[in-house]
From Swiss-Prot:
Residues annotated as glycosylated: 46, 127, 197, 251, 263, 290, 295, 327, 352, 362
Protein name, UniProt field: Probable exopolygalacturonase X
Signal sequence region: 1-21
Summary of the function given for this chain in its UniProt record: Specific in hydrolyzing the terminal glycosidic bond of polygalacturonic acid and oligogalacturonates.
Amino acid sequence: MKLTQATTLLLSLGLSLPVEGFSLSRTNAVGPKPPFRPLPASTPRNKTCQVQSNGDGTDDAPYILAALKQCNNGGKVVFAEDKEYTIGTALDMTFLKHVDLEILGKITFTPDTDYWQENSFKHTFQNATTFFNLGGTDVNVYGGGELNGNGQVWYDLYAEDALILRPILVGIIGLHGGTIGPLKLRYSPQWYQLVANSSDVLFDGIDISGYSSSENEAKNTDGWDTYRSSNIVIQNSVINNGDDCVSFKPNSTEILVQNLHCNGSHGISVGSLGQYQGEVDIVQNVLVYNISMYNASDMARIKVWPGISSAMSEDLQGGGGLGSVQNITYDKMYIENVDWAIEVTQCYGQKNQTLCNENPSNLTISDVYFNDLTGVTSGKNDPNVGTIICSSPDVCSGIHATNIDVKSPDGDSGFVCTNVDEEFLDVECASSS
């Protein structure tokens, strides 16, 4: 059962994309499910630029910028396989057009936490910051090389101060038309990838891993976070991390996620949404297909803040925002040692259920489909394997669950169901709260 289609496909990830470039349509590289809209093709590349390296751990950012400017508009920039590159300067690469970055070697970001807190790129959402911003039109990044965020110094520092600004390893910011992968991503200080204000981007063959070597956990290491982006495809990837495998943040639309192997995560999550009062968060038209999830807190997860201010942690607070979650499908999923097979909540960050019910979410959930989910939970929440908690039936409708064959190690299969129409749930609503 472990050898799902996703696992089988991942055995050949190294062959999934041609290292010489992308002469074919990006749409043809997507499968088995098609993208919501066709992805634009790349134009031919007709020149090559090699990136120099000091080779001694000092900053190579000037060489990278020089090569990008030289080969922009129709070229390929190569990071050699036999070289290691160091980045010690925040790089604005949002000017790119019709260019490839072939990363064959290893790129490491310096562990200068003071510099990066001051100079990393600041984004408005959830205090996100990035080592670099990569954007523009028709940009491909591939080669199978490694980006290393030197995360250990950040894991230890965050344990001392939860308000530090930890950079995201990969910032795809304002990219319209692009392919990312195959690549290895290692030891990100926080999220591995932020995809913001972007469209028509394919992620294919991403290998994510990086755990703490000290007693301080590597926290908030999401694989992907999409934000204000549309027509994004994430496929054929392996993720070993400690937070969401993929998270659809506000205003993510037409997102396809397929053929992933996730381990140690918090699941594939819609949200969190409704965090900021006065903001309108929309996530709609999302398909999650053929996912294997191991040793995780959740498989399929939707997390929405209630209508009252709540605190998830010292650096994560909110509630009262507006918006909607609509037309979300999770299909063909396998779990092993996962706490919740399905978790839907409109009370995110609020432990007092009575208070949540008295202040229901301002953000509606509708037309959600969970199909063909199999496997065994961890047993942590026995006798229940799933939970669907709405803050009010007025803001939560059309949640469907079919062909759900999930049990705990003891054979239990109950669901917690609150303020939800059980007519569409092919599960045992064994308890309510």
